[in-house]
């Protein structure tokens, strides 16, 4: 008998659901265009060396690759669109002067079976601001994301802001042994203050840094910025990261973005992001509906160094949140704090 099932982790999208995704993507592209972002259409396949150059070490296991019969080249189905845009930005400076505001939508495919029933093929829409650094660019990304979520009907979403180097500064200053550093990152990903306190007692760094280590697990929600300022006085390396977060928030609020919270213990995107990070959380979604951040080291890997920041909206999770908000879902879902993986 003919087996009509799909490969594991893949699914068909029927007309009603497809219509929801198409409508959502069109509204997002409308907002991106209003902010000056120009749309790109990119191929599904890339050379493997290009894809690998643009991914974090943790994301390399997500690459689905094969030998192209005609050329013998090893090619990959894109697991992320950002490296493709970095490749194009480096290859075509004539067509993409700096700063470049670019947007896209389309599917990405990941080799591993996703956790918690998440499909391997994910539909995204996003923006990349290439060649622009500093607080103004960080704030612009926050504003575009907030306005995009409002436009699609997720005005109740909250944008949570962090920084890739804040926790790094504390963990570096605490003086942990290499094995203990890995344990610290694992504990922080679980917001396990007790485990961090136990590690701090065995650390060899300054007293201030050791005291700050368990505090990382508490630096989210109301009062997080005030607690972070006190912590940063004990760990000078954390002060610069905190200053970048506060500058971006200040400018974003001047432009009317109020639904913002802070999580300076966020571990998403380790080894990929270099500055301000952010994620959008909406009631009813199974995970973050959007995620992004600053990745200033990526463009240099493709031969055109420069700062960059961007984000992607997960169309499936955004649709899920909208359906629950409109009462179409059968049962409520508890949103998880962390996105499923870095962009």
Swiss-Prot record:
- State where the protein is found: Cytoplasm
Question: What residue stretch is flagged as signal peptide?
Answer: none
Region of interest called Disordered, as start-end residue ranges on this chain: 324-343
Example GO biological process = L-histidine biosynthetic process
Q: Which GO terms describe its molecular function?
A: histidine-tRNA ligase activity
The protein's annotated pathway = Amino-acid biosynthesis; L-histidine biosynthesis; L-histidine from 5-phospho-alpha-D-ribose 1-diphosphate: step 1/9
> Which Gene Ontology cellular component terms are annotated?
cytoplasm
Which keywords does this Swiss-Prot/TrEMBL entry list?
Answer: Amino-acid biosynthesis, Cytoplasm, Histidine biosynthesis
User: Matching InterPro entries, A to Z?
Assistant: aa-tRNA-synth_II (IPR006195), aa-tRNA-synth_II/BPL/LPL (IPR045864), HisRS-like_core (IPR041715), HisRS/HisZ (IPR004516), HisZ (IPR004517)
According to the UniProt entry, which residue ranges have a biased composition of type Basic residues?
327-343
Q: Which PROSITE patterns match?
A: AA_TRNA_LIGASE_II
Pfam families this protein is in?
tRNA-synt_His
Q: What else is known?
A: This function is generally fulfilled by the C-terminal part of HisG, which is missing in some bacteria such as this one.
As for family, the record states:
Belongs to the class-II aminoacyl-tRNA synthetase family. HisZ subfamily.
Q: What does this protein do?
A: Required for the first step of histidine biosynthesis. May allow the feedback regulation of ATP phosphoribosyltransferase activity by histidine.
Q: How does it assemble?
A: Heteromultimer composed of HisG and HisZ subunits.
Q: What is this protein called?
A: ATP phosphoribosyltransferase regulatory subunit
Supply the source organism for this entry: Anaeromyxobacter sp. (strain Fw109-5)
Gene name? hisZ
């Amino acid at each position: 008998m003919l087996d009509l099932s799909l490969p594991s982790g893949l699914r068909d999208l029927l007309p009603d659901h497809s219509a929801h995704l198409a409508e959502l993507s069109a509204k997002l592209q409308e907002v991106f265009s209003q902010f000056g972002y120009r749309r790109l259409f990119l191929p599904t396949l890339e050379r493997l060396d290009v894809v690998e150059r643009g991914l974090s070490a943790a994301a390399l296991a997500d690459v689905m690759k094969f030998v192209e019969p005609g050329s013998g080249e090893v090619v990959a189905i894109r697991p992320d669109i950002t490296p493709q845009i970095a490749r194009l930005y480096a290859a075509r400076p004539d067509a993409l002067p700096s700063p470049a505001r670019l947007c896209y939508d389309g599917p990405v495919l990941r080799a591993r079976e996703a956790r918690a029933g998440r499909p391997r093929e994910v539909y995204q829409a996003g923006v990349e601001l290439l060649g622009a650094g500093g607080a103004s660019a960080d704030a612009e990304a926050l504003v575009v994301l907030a306005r995009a979520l409002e436009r699609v009907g997720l005005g109740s979403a909250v944008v949570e802001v962090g920084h890739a180097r804040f926790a790094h500064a504390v963990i570096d200053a605490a003086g942990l042994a290499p094995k203990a550093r890995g344990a610290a990152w694992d504990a922080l990903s679980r917001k396990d203050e007790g485990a961090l306190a136990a590690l701090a007692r065995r650390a060899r760094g300054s007293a201030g840094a050791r005291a700050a280590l368990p505090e990382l697990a508490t630096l989210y929600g109301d009062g997080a910025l005030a607690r972070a300022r006190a912590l940063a006085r004990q760990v000078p390396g954390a002060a610069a990261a905190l200053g970048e977060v506060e500058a971006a928030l200040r400018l974003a609020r001047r432009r009317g973005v109020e639904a913002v919270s802070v999580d300076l213990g966020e571990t998403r995107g380790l080894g990929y992001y270099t500055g301000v990070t952010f994620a959008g959380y909406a009631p009813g979604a199974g995970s973050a509906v959007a995620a992004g951040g600053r990745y200033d080291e990526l463009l240099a890997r493709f031969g055109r160094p420069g700062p960059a920041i961007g984000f992607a909206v997960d169309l499936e999770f955004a649709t899920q949140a909208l359906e629950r908000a409109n009462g179409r879902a059968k049962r409520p879902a508890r949103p998880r704090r962390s996105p499923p993986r870095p962009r």
